[in-house]
UniProtKB/Swiss-Prot annotation:
It comes from Schizosaccharomyces pombe (strain 972 / ATCC 24843) (Fission yeast). It holds the Pfam family RNase_P_p30. Part of ribonuclease P, a protein complex that generates mature tRNA molecules by cleaving their 5'-ends. Disulfide bonds: none annotated. It is found in: Nucleus. This is Probable ribonuclease P protein subunit 3. It catalyses: Endonucleolytic cleavage of RNA, removing 5'-extranucleotides from tRNA precursor.
Length: 235
């Protein structure tokens, strides 16, 4: 049972022919659940609508979740987080800068910490911050597909992923594809083998595409239930 929590939701939505092909490919490769990821890097607004369609073809067996990834340069207001909690199953945060990374790991309620590991990072992956995220049951994501496209990207991905494994001692890591096309999809066992190159132990690599992803889904469900309970208590 493999899970991929980052399949990019295309700009064209369901009109993009690669979308259904990609999902069908992942299903054929043995994935039982995926998250379609709406990448939002614009100005944060109180209302962000969910464009994701979960039922893509009649014979679909794979379970689909909706995910939003917010790229933030300052701490978001509670209204923004409340809105995306209502709209999306999974909330991922991509903070820009060392200070914001620290605040994100310690203060925000979310499910996945997303970092672009194909670039040279402007901060160190300190055990203090990463360990804090892990202790709060936040999944820390390594996405592999962009590292397949370019030599420089691949080199940075290996360096940064290895640093993350060292900072977290291999705990709390999820490996995702961030794929846009069927050609970028990899079978679960291939992803496990890839993850061992970043110094993840074999059992940790297996968890990164299975158990750790299920933990993220449980965390997301609990976060949404808590939000609904608070909302109902206010009425």
């Amino acid at each position: 049972m493999f899970i991929d929590l980052n399949v990019v939701w295309p700009t064209l939505g369901v009109k993009d022919l690669n979308l259904v092909k990609t999902v069908k490919t992942l299903e054929r490769l043995g994935y039982t659940a995926i998250a379609l990821n709406y990448q939002y890097d614009g100005k944060l607004q109180n209302v962000i609508k969910n464009p994701i369609v979960k039922e893509l073809y009649p014979e679909q067996k794979i379970k689909i979740y909706s995910r939003i990834t917010l790229t933030i340069e300052s701490m978001p207001q509670n209204k923004v987080l409340s809105n995306v909690t209502k709209e999306f199953d999974i909330l991922a945060i991509r903070p820009i800068g060392d200070r914001l990374l620290q605040q994100t790991c310690s203060d925000l309620e979310f499910d996945i910490l997303s970092i672009d590991f194909t670039q040279r990072l402007p901060f160190y992956l300190k055990h203090t911050f990463m360990g804090l995220a892990v202790s709060r049951d936040i999944g820390i994501e390594i996405s592999y597909s962009s590292g397949l496209r370019d030599v420089s990207n691949r080199r940075n991905l290996i360096t940064n992923a290895t640093s993350l494994v060292r900072a977290t001692r291999g705990r709390g890591i999820i490996v995702t594809s961030e794929t846009r096309t069927p050609l970028e999809c990899r079978a679960g066992f291939d992803v496990i083998n890839l993850a061992t190159f970043w110094d993840l132990k074999q059992d940790q690599a297996r968890k990164s595409v299975g158990e750790s992803c299920r933990s993220v889904l449980l965390h997301a469900e609990t976060r949404r239930d808590t939000y609904r309970s608070i909302l109902n208590g206010c009425h």
